Amino acid sequence: MSEHKAIIRWRRTSPDFLQGKYSREHTWTFDGGLTVPASPSPSVVPAPYSNPANVDPEEAFVAAVSSCHMLVYLMLAYQHGFQVDSYDDEAAGVMTKNERGVLWISAVRLKPNIVYSGEKVPSSSDEEQLHHLAHEQCFIANSIKTLVTVAKGT
């Protein structure tokens, strides 16, 4: 078992908190010391109470799903003898309302573009199988109920 931590910090910067007129900007600090400016998505909380330049939880969720899938995929490619030179994913999440009318990210679409080199290059079928295994072994995917699909990259 391992434990993973993040420190989330928010401070009131205006006197209008009780009127709902307050910034939702905050920071995420990770165990390696990296601090990331965060904010709700402007599609959820409009400016000036959000900051579109900051990472929002919805983007971070999509990035976590994509990153975990990629890391498992790279491990599997190596184990199967496929040399990966680059892996770029244009992942996207879709926010909808569930049956109770509550917003959630109902789907994440991964769209990886993977470049290989060497004598052994995977077939389309090999790639599909590696993506299937990566999804099965990704602990983030195993922790969520969101539908995750993989589309062909460009």
Task: Name each region found by the language model.
Residues 1-63, 74-154:
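Extended beta-strand/beta-hairpin segments
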